[in-house]
Amino acid sequence: MSSSTRVGLKEQLHPLIRDLATGIEATWQRWLNLEPYAAMPADLGYIEGKLEGERLQIENRCYQSREFRKLHLELARVGNNLDILHCVLFPRTTFDLPMFGADLVGGRGQISAAIVDLSPTTIARELSNDYIAGLTALPNPTFQGLRELPTWGDIFSSFCLFIRPGSPEEEAAFLDRALGFLQVHCQQAAAATALTDPEAIATVLEQQRYYCEQQRRNDKTRRVLEKAFGDDWADRYMTTMLFDLPSD
């Protein structure tokens, strides 16, 4: 699929999704030395299918850097009824860093779910003092439509924000907070020193595996993929693109 078509997909999405996608990639470019993701499955960069008669489009943009084995931004659209942004940064297991994750789900001009977090997949199983200081310093507006985390949400931090934005002002405030989280994360990652202790690296690996296993329990995502592409394809997509386990 040509790059012009992929750009066209982003331009069709809800304005908040467009703005967050643009801001995410700009932040990556500012703070990190990006390279193409070496393990990108050749057939999963751009995907089309049908979901209940509606055209389903999925675009995946993936990179890697010194600090992150994968930086993943997924954009998706189902007909005119559903727009999706999904973003996760997977640290290399030689870096004791949390997992940045952000998701937006919208349809018919309304964002129904917006979540952002830095999940403490770290040796101490909590965010470091530097992260806490950086996040605490960000503007922290009040949101009205707070949503309940899923039952498998023990992977999230106390800073996790999960809302249904009720106004353009809340959408703008969420955008600022999500990009603030990402900037703190990229700044901390760029300054981080690689681990050398094998036990510490093994602990980070274990924590990332648990994060991925919990995220794979998201039945809503799996059901959409199964309806559009079948069970086997959905399982492959969940385990190789969305939440692949680290091997390094």
From Swiss-Prot:
HAMAP family associated with the record: Ferredoxin_bilin_red (MF_00618)
InterPro entries, per database record: Ferredoxin-dep_bilin_Rdtase, Ferredoxin_bilin_OxRdtase
Record function comment: Catalyzes the four-electron reduction of biliverdin IX-alpha (2-electron reduction at both the A and D rings); the reaction proceeds via an isolatable 2-electron intermediate, 181,182-dihydrobiliverdin.
GO molecular function, one term: cobalt ion binding
One GO term (biological process): phytochromobilin biosynthetic process
Keyword Oxidoreductase applies: yes
Entry keywords, A to Z: Oxidoreductase
Family indicated by similarity: Belongs to the HY2 family.
Protein EC: 1.3.7.5
Keyword ATP-binding on entry: no
Catalytic activity: (2R,3Z)-phycocyanobilin + 4 oxidized [2Fe-2S]-[ferredoxin] = biliverdin IXalpha + 4 reduced [2Fe-2S]-[ferredoxin] + 4 H(+)
Protein name in UniProt: Phycocyanobilin:ferredoxin oxidoreductase
Pfam families named among the record's database cross-references: Fe_bilin_red (PF05996)
Top-level taxon in the UniProt lineage: Bacteria
